[in-house]
Amino acid sequence: MIARQECAATVLGGPTTVLDLGGLRIVSDPTFDDPGPHGYLTKTAGPAVTEDQLGPVDLVLVSHDNHPDNLDDRGRALALAAPLVLTTRSGAGRLGAPATGLPLWTSHTVPRPDGGELIVTAVPAVHGPEDAERDADGFVNCEVIGFILSGPGLPVVYVSGDNASIGTVAEIARRTPSIDAVVLHAGAARVPARFRNRALSLDSIRAAAAAAILGLAEIIPAHYDGWTHFSEGRDDLVRAFDDAGLTARLRLVDHGTWIPLRP
């Protein structure tokens, strides 16, 4: 079992990230299946840490349940065994208990073992090009949310979910001006049948642009490897952040390595 940290994050592969905050163990977008085909997507690598090594999980964040690279079979089992899952409103309906759907800009408060509170706020995400056709509910691709995690004595952490919109990042930065760290989904995910094969998540150049918008926040990239439809990887991120002069803000380490988080 991996030991709990006081305040830290680690990316396990794909989008899956563990955050230890205020005595809570939080997992975002859990994907623990073995490599292989998952419908029209193909997974190429398993996680750096398996779900049985995590120990008890207090909270699962699911940006969307529609795609297996964000919630696969074993990730779904982990989520449904947790005390609480926070996700989209439509996703909560599909997942059932213990999932709670959060409308945009609403918050859910989670008690912390240290006596404080963790506040989880749902923020927007656009899962594809801004000008793409939207569904009947106004969503590109499907309903997706990101999350702002905050609380007394804790860093403010933004988990982006699958977002391709710089405008959305700017809106979040305006409304949450004191973000300390960002789990930023990148990878320029592309599916030929969707939106003329345009990116469904941030490419590396736009990830660096998002970092510039987000001020002094440390950037922890996720969602850039482990699946064949991710068209950009680690080297692209390193190059883009170097070109932008933002390498000092980039926290790109081996999967399973803890990154300390500070207010």
Specify the residue positions occupied by each region the protein language model found.
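Metallo-beta-lactamase
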Residues: 1-4, 85-155, 239-262
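Cap/insert and terminal regions of metallo-dependent hydrolase folds
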Residues: 90-93, 164-255
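Conserved catalytic scaffold of divalent metal-dependent phosphoesterases
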Residues: 27-34, 102-110, 117-128, 165, ...
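Alpha-helix capping/helix-boundary segments
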Residues: 67, 75, 91-92, 106-107, ...
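Conserved beta-strand elements of the Class I
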Residues: 10, 18, 27, 58-61, ...
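Active-site neighborhood of phospho(di)ester-bond hydrolases with catalytic His/Asp-centered motifs
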Residues: 27-29, 56-71, 86-89, 157-163, ...
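Zn-dependent metallo-beta-lactamase
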Residues: 1-27, 31-36, 40-44, 126, ...
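Pre-active-site segment of Zn-dependent metallo-hydrolases
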Residues: 21-62, 66-69, 73-78, 128-137, ...
